[in-house]
A protein has these predicted regions:
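Intrinsically disordered, low-complexity segments enriched in small/flexible residues
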Residues: 2-106, 112, 117
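Short glycine-rich loop/turn motifs
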Residues: 92-96, 105, 140-141, 168-171, ...
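A structural preference for short, pocket-lining loop segments at secondary-structure junctions
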Residues: 95, 99-112, 127-154
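Conserved catalytic cores of soluble enzyme domains
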Residues: 146-226
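Short alpha-helical segments and helix-capping/turn motifs at coil-helix boundaries
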Residues: 91-95, 127-130, 167, 189
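A short, small-residue-rich loop immediately preceding and capping a beta-strand
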Residues: 106-109, 117-120, 140-145, 178-189
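Flexible beta-alpha connector loops of hexameric P-loop NTPases
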Residues: 114-123, 155-161
Length: 226
């Protein structure tokens, strides 16, 4: 078999400069990938006070220890929520990826309620939709840890509202295809957050914590001011 040997001069000025530039970009990527986690974990005292795990803690306990978790759409929404690179939150309010639960490869979605109470942004919706597509294409069980304030009313758009129907329709398609859709309801979930468990094949609700309602008093006040 022919051997293709590299002729790169790892001591050259060009190589060293490009290597330094690439490492700088890798560090920037790692910082962006970890930004959402950092912001969410800043709310940990609030979760502790409520007797709850943080979204990442709950995800870690769900997944098989030592097995890989491949995140999907880590950079979704970067510089879309805001043009300020220092304030934009890559990944938005959703954690999505492929991991193993009891030895079974699954698509797992987590509402990151440490960021904007887990409300669904446009970018978060795209990330969730992509996870649903992968679940259908690859025939992987769809598992959703639900705690969401519903749609992002502070940045409401008609386009975002109309595209939201695809998220719920996809759950029906998964169920029709015989792919299990499982929701773990572990906090308050309003409006769209209530649709997710409502359209699931199996729902596990945490006693005293899991609540789902289409429009509770806080949502009505936020939407109408009354």
């Amino acid at each position: 078999m022919a051997v293709f040997a590299s002729k790169i001069n790892t001591s050259s000025e060009t190589f060293l400069r490009q290597r330094a530039e690439m490492l700088e970009l890798v560090d920037k990527l790692n910082e962006l990938n970890g930004r959402g986690r950092t912001i969410s974990e800043q709310r940990k005292p609030r979760f502790d006070k409520r007797g709850q795990l943080t979204p990442r803690e709950r995800l870690a306990r769900l997944l098989d220890p030592g097995m890989p978790f491949l995140e999907i759409g880590n950079l979704a929404g970067y510089l879309v929520d805001t043009k300020n690179p220092a304030k934009s939150i890559p990944g938005s309010t959703v954690i999505a990826g492929i991991g193993f639960i009891s030895g079974v490869r699954c698509v797992v979605v987590v509402d990151d309620s440490g960021i904007m109470a887990g409300s669904m942004t446009t970018a978060g919706g795209y990330r969730l939709r992509r996870a649903e597509q992968i679940s259908l294409e690859q025939k992987l069980p769809f598992v959703h840890l639900v705690e969401s304030a519903g749609g992002d009313l502070m940045n409401y758009t008609v386009e975002g509202f109309s595209s939201g129907g695809a998220l719920f329709g996809a759950l029906a398609q998964l169920s029709k295809a015989g792919i299990p859709v499982i929701s773990i309801l572990h906090g308050s979930s309003t409006a769209g957050g209530a649709y997710m468990p409502g359209l699931s094949d199996y729902v596990i609700a945490i006693k005293g914590k899991g609540r789902a309602f289409l429009a509770g008093p806080p949502l009505l006040k936020a939407a109408t001011g009354e």
